[in-house]
Design a protein with these regions (language model features):
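Amphipathic protein-protein interaction modules
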Residues: 60-113
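Compositionally biased, low-complexity repeat tracts
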Residues: 25, 53, 63-67, 75, ...
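A sequence-level detector of short, solvent-exposed, charge-rich linear segments
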Residues: 32-40, 61, 65, 89-93, ...
């Protein structure tokens, strides 16, 4: 990911994040400071879909709320900022350190874990981000797999 593909969020993109975070807090009762609580809600929705108790169409909403809430939590907790990565001719939501040395993809992570029907991943993702930000030693391409996973896992 080349740094020149990053840009600040537009007002509409910022509103999208805010609306998804507010939905999670107000409508679902999710604690925005607790990745385990976010993960529990994600896991419950995934289980309902797998068991046929919820329509598959809820995936986009669940992934949107999960990505927005996790990214919001990490921005507040670690001083990260939202941006848009326009690499590969598509826009991807990212959170990055002020120095832009550490870039993470919370929406991509939520989508990946939804597709793979994986739960119990948000606390680990949050811990990985915390460690990388503390060290500012994130890999050059955080989407690339590493021995400990990627910034999408």
């Amino acid at each position: 990911m080349a740094e020149n593909t990053l840009r600040p969020l537009t007002a509409d993109e910022q509103r999208f994040i805010e609306q998804h975070v507010l939905f999670g807090v107000r409508e679902r009762g999710i604690d925005p400071e607790n990745p385990a609580a976010m993960d529990a809600e994600f896991s419950q929705a995934l289980a309902a879909v797998v068991q046929g108790a919820a329509p598959q169409g809820i995936a986009q909403n669940v992934v949107g709320v999960a990505g927005a809430m996790l990214g919001h939590h990490l921005c507040i907790r670690h001083g990260l900022v939202w941006a848009m990565d326009g690499a590969q001719d598509r826009n991807r939501w990212v959170i990055l350190s002020q120095e832009k040395n550490a870039v993470f993809y919370p929406f991509d992570a939520a989508a990946k874990h939804w597709r793979e029907q994986e739960t119990d991943w948000m606390p680990g993702f949050a811990a990985m981000v915390a460690h990388a930000v503390e060290d500012e030693g994130a890999p050059a391409d955080p989407a690339a797999p590493s021995a400990q996973g990627s910034a999408e896992s």
